[in-house]
Regions:
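A membrane-interface helix-boundary motif in multi-pass transporters
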Residues: 8-25, 287-327
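Helix-to-loop junctions at the C-terminal end of transmembrane segments
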Residues: 129-141, 181-195
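A late C-terminal transmembrane helix in Major Facilitator Superfamily
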Residues: 260-294
Length: 370
């Protein structure tokens, strides 16, 4: 997020292709790492003498078995609704901030206009990620709190630098930072305490609150440069927390709801359904944005508005309410799923490690009897 504008503006000639090329390079690096991992894993299997267990062959009837499951559709629809309110929003979020915040031009010779600030912010992001993530696994309380304080201070510095840059992209880049720190905490909580269905509901509630805040509260601070940025930062961070809550509880819940023999096919179908939403809703948001801002479309068509003027003039209220409605539907499915779990005892509210503990206890009893 933070480097895309930097590459797009290299040399003073704006070109999106450079940012896309940077993304392609990252994907190529990831592919190379996967290939290396694949051969290292094969080598380890050969050294240890372990062979992969033969799975049951895939059958077309498995798909029918999965699609005929009522609970599968609850999870799949909750997934597509939630993620369709997150990922398509990211596409429009920077422009939404440009339309709702009051930015001032930064002097070209100012430190805040240099590329060095972007690099410094990226380093700070890494510091936040490392310290917050490491604090989750630190047993020494003094070190744990020291890492947390370091992470919080770094986050405040990052937010201050984003404000001084007067850049919507720098402000929205804070989105994943809180998620990085709390995702391990939430995952550990689900493993040891459970409450996955409750976390799905809470994540959906936070999602609704954030989109409604962007729709109705943020525009009220249009004339307040500091107040608007503060509201934006807080809302984006809370949205990141929601983005941690749902995945941390959703994906570990699937094996509890689907037969283990078709779990791979179930995940594939969920992602397939999710990608349909990720294709459809960006188009829908664009259509709604144009239909609710006819004066901008007309101004661009007859030349009375330049693209630069139009880009900061859109009213995002209706698209944001639409995304909040997706969150409301996800909330309904989450509530239904929790009630169904209470009735059918799928174990969504139970910790994931209980089964292992029971099996371990049974093994100890058998060993003692022998």
């Amino acid at each position: 997020m933070i480097f895309s504008p930097l590459f797009a503006n290299l040399g003073g000639d704006i070109s999106v292709s450079r940012s896309v090329a940077f993304g392609v390079i990252l994907l190529m690096v990831a592919l190379i790492m996967f290939i290396v991992y694949f051969f290292m894993d094969r080598k380890l299997d050969a050294q240890t003498g372990e062979a992969e267990e033969k799975d049951e062959p895939f059958k077309i009837s498995d798909i029918g078995k999965i699609l005929s499951s009522y609970v599968f559709w609850l999870v799949a629809l909750l997934c597509v609704l939630y993620y369709s309110a997150i990922f398509p929003f990211q596409k429009y979020a920077v422009n939404m901030l440009q339309c709702n915040l009051s930015f001032t031009d930064v002097a070209p010779d100012s430190f805040w206009a240099t590329d060095a600030v972007t690099v410094i912010q990226y380093v700070i992001m890494i510091v936040i990620a490392l310290t917050s993530f490491a604090s989750n696994f630190q047993k020494n309380k003094s070190m744990k709190y020291a890492l947390l304080v370091t992470s919080i201070v770094a986050l405040v510095i990052y937010c201050y630098m984003g404000f001084m840059r007067q850049s919507a992209s720098a402000i929205f880049a804070v989105f994943p930072l809180l998620a990085v720190g709390i995702t391990p905490i939430l995952g550990n909580y689900v493993d040891n305490k459970g409450k996955a269905a409750t976390m799905l509901i809470l994540g959906s509630l936070l999602l609704i609150a954030c989109h409604l805040t962007f729709a109705f509260i943020l525009p009220m601070f249009k004339g307040s440069p500091v107040g608007g940025v503060i509201v934006a930062y807080v809302t984006i961070l809370v949205l990141g927390a929601s983005f941690s809550l749902v995945p941390a509880s959703l994906w570990p819940s699937v094996p509890k709801l689907v037969d283990a023999n078709v779990i791979g096919s179930a995940y594939a179908l969920i992602f397939w359904i999710q990608n349909i939403g990720l294709w459809l809703f960006p188009l829908l948001i664009g259509k709604v944005l144009d239909s609710t801002n006819p004066q901008i479309v007309e101004g661009l068509a007859n030349g009375t508005l330049t693209p630069e003027q139009a880009a900061v003039s859109y009213n995002y209220t209706v698209p944001l309410v639409m995304l909040a409605c997706l969150g409301a539907l996800a909330l309904i499915f989450g509530i239904v799923l929790k009630r169904l779990d209470a009735k059918k005892h799928y174990g969504l509210e139970l910790p994931n490690v209980v089964k292992d503990e029971i099996e371990g206890g049974e093994a100890e009893i058998v060993a003692a009897e022998e």
